[in-house]
Amino acid sequence: EMLRSLVGSEMCIRDRPITTAFVAMGLMGIIDTMIVGNYNTDQLAYIGLANSIFVVLFTIPIGLLQGVLIKSSQKFGAHKFQSTGKIYNEGRKYSFILAIVFTLLGIQGETILRLLGQDDDMVKHGGEVLRVFVFSIPFILMYVNANFFLQSIRRPYVGMYGIIAANILNIIVNPVLVYGKFGFPELGAVGSATSTLIVRIFLAVYILAYIRRMKKNPKLNKRFGLDRSYSTWWNDSRRTRKIGYGIAIMTIATNGSFSIVSTFAGWMGQHTMATFVIMINVSTLLFMICFSISQATSIVVANAYGRGDRKGILMATNAGYVISLTTIITLITILYSCLLYTSDAA
C-alpha cells in the first residue's frame, strides 16, 4: 500500500509539470491557428499545409532523441548520476547532426509540396511558411535534448516555466507580425511562422542558459557529470540511439498518416484545408496531453528499472494507464466553438 502511494505521488509529481508543458505547447498551436484563422482563411490553409510537412520533419528527430530521456532516467534511478550528463552531451552532438539533416530536407519545401500534387498557389505560399518553420528545427532539438535530460534528473519544472513564458511571448509577437502592427510588415501566415521561430529560439536559449548555470555550480557539475564528453561518443551512445529508432518509426506512422490526409485536404482547396486544420488542432492538443502522461510514466518506469524494482515498474505502468484513461474520458466531454478559430462562415 505504501509502494502504491509512493508510485502514485511520484506519477503526479512527474505528470503535473510535464503535462502542463505539453498543454502549453498545444495551446501555442491553438493560439496560432486562432490568430491566423481570424486574419484570413486562405492563410490558415497555407500554414496548415506547411505544418503537415513540418510536423514530420521535427517529430522524427525528437523520436530519435527519446533514448536520451529513457537511458538518463535509468542511470538516475540506478544512482549513476554522472552518467546522466554524459548521455546529455551525447544527445547534444546527435541532435546537431539531426538538425542539419532535417533542416536541409525542409528547405526543399516547395519541391516537396509540388511532388505531393498541390496547386501552384498552395506550393508558393505553403512553401514560404515551411521555409520559415524549418529554421526552427535546430532550436527545437537543442531544447528537447536539454529538457529530456532535466526531466530525467527530476527537474521537469524548468521546461514547464520555459514553455509558459514562451506562450506569453507568442501571444505578444504573433498578432504583431500577422496583422502588421507597430510599424511591422503585415506577413499573415509567414508572420505566425516567424513568431514560432522567435519563440523556439527563446526556448533554446533559456534552457541552455539553465544548463550552463548548472555547469558553473561545481557541486552540480560534478554530480551530474556535465563535463563528461568523449571522442567515442558515437559508439558509446549506440544503445541510446537504438531506443529512439523504434519511437521514430512509430512517429513516422502516426504523423505520416496525418500528413497524407492533409495532402488530400490540400487537393480539395483552401477552405477544406482550413477546416481540417481546425479539427486537427483540437485533436492534437488532446494527443499531446496523453503523450505527456506517457512520458511521465516512462521516467518513473525507467527509474524503477534502474534500481531493479519490478513491482515499482508494474505499479507505475498501471498508474499511467489509469491517469491516461481518466484524462481521455474527461477531455472528450469538452466542447469547443469554431467561432474562436475563424469568423468565416464558409
What are these regions (language model features)?
Residues 101-131, 330-343:
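Short membrane-interface helical motifs at transmembrane helix boundaries
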Residues 8-10, 14, 189, 193-196, ...:
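Interhelical loop/hinge segments that connect adjacent transmembrane helices in multipass membrane
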Residues 34, 103-107, 171, 175, ...:
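Membrane-embedded alpha-helical segments of multi-pass transporters/permeases
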Residues 14, 18, 55, 95, ...:
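Residue-level signature of transmembrane alpha-helical cores of multipass secondary-active transporters
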Residues 23, 27-45, 113-120, 176-187, ...:
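Helix-terminus/linker motif at the lipid-water interface of multi-pass membrane proteins
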Residues 44-103, 107, 140-154, 158-159, ...:
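Small-residue-rich hydrophobic transmembrane alpha-helices
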Residues 1-8, 13, 341-345:
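Single conserved hydrophobic/aromatic residue that forms the stacking wall/gate
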Residues 157, 168-204, 337-340:
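Membrane-interface helix-loop junctions in multi-pass transport and translocation proteins
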